[in-house]
Amino acid sequence: MSLAHVLLTSLIEKPSTGIDLARRFDRSMGFFWNATHQQIYRELSGMQQKNWISTLEEHDSTSRKKTYQVEQLGRTELADWMVKQSPPAQLREELMVRLRAEAQLGGNTVLPELERHLILHKENLKIYQTIFAKDFAN
């Protein structure tokens, strides 16, 4: 998966300016993919060069805002990408290494951190359930 596919998905949901897309990204796709605002803008430029996206005309001629929308080539790219196989993500989890170390050293020192992670995962689960309910209401 690439940032371009994340952005195509977001733009299919709603045509957006770069800043609006970056803000929405932080609240939704950011749970699954990390990107800086600079990376988002650079990727939008590349996607526009590939004719995957275009900009809508702004009615205010003094505005420099660009509202991006997905073009047919972008939809085709996203559809092609959706059916491709992908390898499982490489798991790199510091907490799991701490558990292995604790098994050797003892002390039961990792339990508070495990409990904190459990709380954080439950909070994320609530967010994911809200997104699911909104996106798959039917």
List the model feature ranges, each with a label.
Residues 1-90:
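Basic helix-turn-helix/winged-helix DNA-binding cores
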Residues 3, 25-28, 102-113, 138:
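Short amphipathic alpha-helical segments at helix-loop
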Residues 14-15, 33, 103, 107, ...:
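Flexible interhelical turns and helix-capping residues at alpha-helix boundaries
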Residues 22, 44, 114-115, 129:
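A generic alpha-helix structural signal
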Residues 48, 75, 122-129:
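Structural signal for well-ordered, non-membrane alpha-helices
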Residues 79-125:
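Amphipathic alpha-helical dimerization/coiled-coil segments
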Residues 129-138:
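Acidic interhelical loop/turn segments
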